[in-house]
Each structure stands twice: as C-alpha cells, then as structure tokens.
Amino acid sequence: MDFSSNIASQLNAGTILPEGIVIITLMVVLIGDLIGGRNARMWLPYGAIAGLLAALFALYTAWDNPSTIGFLGAFNGDNLSIVFRGIIALSTIVTLLMSIRYVEQTGTSLAEFIGIMLTATLGGMFLSGANELVMIFISLEMLSISSYLMTGYMKRDPRSNEAALKYLLIGASSSAIFLYGSSLLYGLSGGETTLDTISAKILASDGSSSLGLAIALVFVIAGIAFKISAVPFHQWTPDVYEGSPTPVVAFLSVGSKAAGFALAIRLLVTAFSSIVDEWHLIFTALAILSMVLGNVVALAQTSMKRMLAYSSIGQAGFVMIGLTAGTDAGYSSMVFYLLVYLFMNLGAFSGVILFSLRTGTDQISEYAGLYQKDPLLTLGLSLCLLSLGGIPPLAGFFGKIYLFWAGWQAELYGLVLLALVTSVVSIYYYIRVVKMMVVKEPHEMSDSVKNYPEIRWNLEGMRPLQVGLVLSVIATSLAGILSNPLFSLANDSVTSTPILQSTIVNTRISQGEIPSSTIDP
C-alpha cells in the first residue's frame, strides 16, 4: 500500500487530466468514425469541440494547484503551462469551427482531419508543460508530424503536396538540430534529463563558461526559432502557408507558435539560467530580423495567405520583445499578446476561408468592393486586420502597448523604437486590404465580387464558420475594451511560476538592480 501510494504521489497523474480528456475525445472521434453512420459522423466535430471545452474546464480547476510536478519531474502543470495549454486548446476549437465546411467541400474525411488536429493539440499541450528532455522531444515530434500530415491533407491539390514536402524536409532538419543541442545538454550535465537538474549540474561543474553550452544554446534556439517562424529560420513559412489548407495555416499560426514560445520560456529559463544574457542577445537579433523582414516583405504580397504568413513572422518578432526583456512585465505582456493574437489572427483566417469558399481565390485584389456584397464578412475581417495592426481600441493595440512598455522598462530602447516603426509599416498593408474592401466604388469591384454567390448560411458547415468568425471578432473587440482581466490572468501566471521568478531575480542581480547580499542563501 505504501509502495503504491508513493508511486501515485510521484506520478501525480492529475496534472495531465486535460490532456487525458483530449485523448479520450480523440478515441471517441476515431471509433465514432469507424462504427457510426453518416448521421453520427456529422456530430463528430461538435463532440471534439465539447471534449476540448471539457479540457479547458479541467485547466481552469487546476489553476493555483499546489502540486504541479508530475511523472517524476517530466511534466510541470504550473499556471504558466495552464495558460499556454489553454491557448492551444482554444485555437483548436476555433480552427475546428472553420474546418467543417472547408474539409467537406474537398471531399476528404473530416474525422481523420479532426483526429490529426487533436493529436497536434496533444503535442502542443504536452510541450507547454514538458520539463524533461525526452518529454520535450516526444511532444515536439507529436506536434510536428501531425502538422506535416495536416499540411498535405488535401491530397488532390499539388500546392498542398508541395507545402507538405517542404515542411517535412525543413522540419526534420530543425528537429535534428534541436536534438543535437539537447544531447549536448545531456552530456554537459552528466547524463541528466530533467531541466532543473541539468541547470544545477552545469552550475555545480562551472560549465556555464564552456564552449559546449554555447553550442547547445545555438542549436536549441535554432530548433525553437523554426517553430515560431523567426528569421532566418522562416523560409518554410510563406510557401507552407500559401499551399496548405487554410484551417491548418490558422492552427500553425497560433497553436503551434504558442507551443514554441512555451518551450522557449521553459527550456531557456531553466536549462540555460547561467547564460541568460547570451540568449537574450540572440533573441534580440532574431526579433530585429523578424520585425523588419516580416513587415517589409508583407508589403509586396498579392496573396492574402502569403501576406498573413509574413505578418505572422513580424508578430513573432513583437512577442520576442517580452522574452528578451526577461522581467515580470515582459513575460506577462508576452502571454497577454498571445492570448489576444489567438482571436484576431484566427478571426482573420476565418474571413479568408469564407471568401475563398465563395470565390475560390485568396488574391488581395479580388477583395475589391466586398462591402457591397457581404457587409458581415467585411466588418469581421476589417476589425481583425486592424487589431493585428494595433489600431485602438482593439485588442492588438493594448497587446503592443504592454509589450513595448515592458521593453522600454527593461531599457531595450532601440528594440522598442524599431518595433514602433515596423508596427506602423504593418498598419499600411492591413489598411490597404480594408480600404480595398470598403472604399471601392461599385464599378471598381473585382470579378470575384461581381460574381459573388448568394449568401446562404444554412449550408452544411457554414453556420459553425460564421460562429467562429463572430466569436473571434467579439473577443478581439472586448479584449481591447476590457483588457485588464486578461492582463491580470497573464500577470498571475508569471508571478506564480517559481522558475520565472528565480530567473528574474538573477537577471536583476546581474544588472545591478538588486545587491546580491539581499538574497537569502
């Protein structure tokens, strides 16, 4: 009895209850597809959404749980991981809403698509709390392989096949690079795999000044930068976004990116705590390159999906300001921005899907005069694009204000000024699309808008897509007007996470803000 109680306490399986619910949901979807008839299969996406909502409720009940370590230290269910797991689950819910009509119209299996997406969600959720090298790599591969499959899901579309092949080849290379960096950490720590123990062993052996740790840092950051589409590891992003099914692109731009930032925070803050200044410097360079290239190249794009691809690269640069600041405000603003980015970006992709389903194109020029034929779509897409640009009083404005303020407080003056300039550049290409939809006269309508089909929301799968768009627009608007609760949530997730607090204190000591004598031994 004592032995079993000891094992149960060390496993602490309750920390992965949300993931357990998603696993059960995945099994129900697959079994329902096998044994259910056509009518039963119609309800599978809604069953998947219900399971994800149950997982979100389980995450809510786990908030401020005093026992967060599970599976012998391999998983940490702290408040920070809860927020990131919630972002990934929410992004999957909205993506499923926009996928039903899109996937059915292509003639492929919706249940298989949902199963792959739930597997990717599981990988992202596990990655957000992974605290051990093996757990990190398995979770990363679960997310990556599922993403490759979703990218090439439209087997009859040559562009989808090309995107999947590019994503697979570059993704496999980045995984190998990340794995090599992780193996160096394993060797430098004397064969340890838990992140806390790795950090302690490296500090005890005075390995913080070793060349091996510097090489490990470079390789690990290269792997993470691929996942978050940071320049110069962004080459796959425009082609994959343009060729992949649009719902998949929406998930990659939010869920996959959130998982990448969760990994960046936990791995770098814990395992590389002895060389914080070095990885801050690297991320400063990545942020500069991402903001400049992402926003400048987006100006020249003619495809909506390709423009949003470069936009997501620029947005990743903005988020990296919070990571580089390394303060309470920096991490909090980073989490807050990802929370609001979830809704404004998925709302924009919902609009792109609606337009492409009705016209068969995603060319920006074809949106000319859309307001005359579809005011709801024009309003929703315009609000989401303006929020991405940071126009007040929408959510994106407050997200950028918090990020820039955190960077300024951390004395990253040059980085913040560059972010302001590139943010203004981004406003231009977002407003260009809005202007094209709203301002154009009837005789200036594009051919696609002139031949715009009658709006019929009663078609199968169209109502969920409408719900996804409306929810995203409402959340984007309300998150801007009522941003304080969301920022309090982000701030609580940071201040209640011990690994972040210890790193923040060490950073302030190294900068001379706190004398080391004031810290208890």
UniProtKB/Swiss-Prot annotation:
Residues making up the signal peptide according to the UniProt record: none
Protein name: NAD(P)H-quinone oxidoreductase subunit 2
Role: NDH-1 shuttles electrons from an unknown electron donor, via FMN and iron-sulfur (Fe-S) centers, to quinones in the respiratory and/or the photosynthetic chain. The immediate electron acceptor for the enzyme in this species is believed to be plastoquinone. Couples the redox reaction to proton translocation, and thus conserves the redox energy in a proton gradient. Cyanobacterial NDH-1 also plays a role in inorganic carbon-concentration.
Family membership noted in the UniProt record: Belongs to the complex I subunit 2 family.
PANTHER family: NADH DEHYDROGENASE (PTHR22773)
InterPro entries found in the cross-reference section: NADH-Q_OxRdtase_suN/2 (IPR010096), ND/Mrp_TM (IPR001750), Ndh2_N (IPR045693)
Keywords: Membrane, NAD, NADP, Plastoquinone, Quinone, Thylakoid, Translocase, Transmembrane, Transmembrane helix, Transport
Keyword Transport: yes
GO molecular function ontology, one term from the record: NADH dehydrogenase (ubiquinone) activity
The keyword Iron appears for this protein: no
Gene Ontology annotations of biological process type: ATP synthesis coupled electron transport; photosynthesis, light reaction
Reaction it catalyzes: a plastoquinone + NADH + (n+1) H(+)(in) = a plastoquinol + NAD(+) + n H(+)(out); a plastoquinone + NADPH + (n+1) H(+)(in) = a plastoquinol + NADP(+) + n H(+)(out)
GO CC terms: plasma membrane-derived thylakoid membrane
E.C. designation(s): 7.1.1.-
Domain of life: Bacteria
Topology with respect to the bilayer: Multi-pass membrane protein
Subunit structure: NDH-1 can be composed of about 15 different subunits; different subcomplexes with different compositions have been identified which probably have different functions.
